[in-house]
């Protein structure tokens, strides 16, 4: 082969290799669906709150949560509005494989009942597994309210150690929220329990409807990082990715708090 032909042949090989590498690189890039995606933000205090979903490179959810700017902890109302102001935060579309629909987020300037346990100023983060219309139907003026409140989920669908408070379900069901369940191992004894942060669960009309982290403003200002296992039920009412961990962390660079439900694991209804 002449030298010119050798050079031309070698050049063709180089071009082919570069083209192949480019195509492989592009293919990998197109298949990588990882990232963190955000829902629309809303104002709270002097800052903002927004939901997010984090996916792995296959597009499966790893974590969902709320990002809360540090300024949100300042400029908060000193008195609660009547009715209370609730932020309804949609998740981004990338959270659709999880069981969560939206987050109801609110600030309690004087805590809430039972005040002997949860009377400190704090935030509630209801991660709902039903849509906003279903939550809005939790209305004590409806004639079937008491019946639907008393329709508790099958025990196999309730996370381990969670029970309803003393009293009837109708008395304990909060309008436009649901019936709150507490963990019997949390030591909720009046006069002894020191509320900093806790995870509540909830139901309505036979359905396990929400997971609710609650935490005081005072505790959040300490900027602690925590990650805890979420207690699981024996079975699941619906198929989808359920969380196995709950976490709180502060990003000093972004000046943001993350309240997360992570360790997403696919579960099947049974």
Roles of regions detected by a PLM:
Residues 6, 11, 128-130:
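Alpha-helical and His/Cys-centered functional microenvironments
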Residues 8-9, 15, 182, 195:
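Intrinsically disordered, low-complexity, compositionally biased regions/tails
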